[in-house]
């Protein structure tokens, strides 16, 4: 599975480290970045097969990152957030 690359975009180092450890233990190649601008740039350079994307990010929020990625790719994006309600 090392051919499968996952990009984790999350500003909480505890969450990004946990996801990285979990997916690397399952055999995936994982890259982590901590803000929306880095997320878009890393997507273009790293060319991941899957993106795990936090909603609340510094510099550029998860919705904007998702829109920018969607302009260039249809790769799967899973939104990861601590928000508990739709209206949050």
Region spans (language model):
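Acidic catalytic/metal-coordinating carboxylates
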Residues: 35-38, 61-64, 69, 88
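Active-site residues of response regulator receiver
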Residues: 54, 81
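The feature encodes the CheY-like receiver
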Residues: 16, 58, 85
């Amino acid at each position: 599975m090392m051919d499968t690359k996952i990009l984790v975009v999350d500003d909480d180092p505890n969450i990004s480290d946990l996801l990285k450890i979990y997916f690397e233990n399952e055999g995936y190649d994982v890259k982590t970045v901590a803000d929306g601008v880095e997320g878009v740039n890393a997507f273009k350079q790293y060319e991941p097969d899957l993106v795990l994307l936090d909603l609340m990010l510094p510099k550029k929020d998860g919705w904007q990152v998702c829109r920018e990625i969607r302009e260039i790719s249809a790769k799967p994006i899973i939104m990861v957030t601590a928000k508990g309600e739709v209206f949050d």
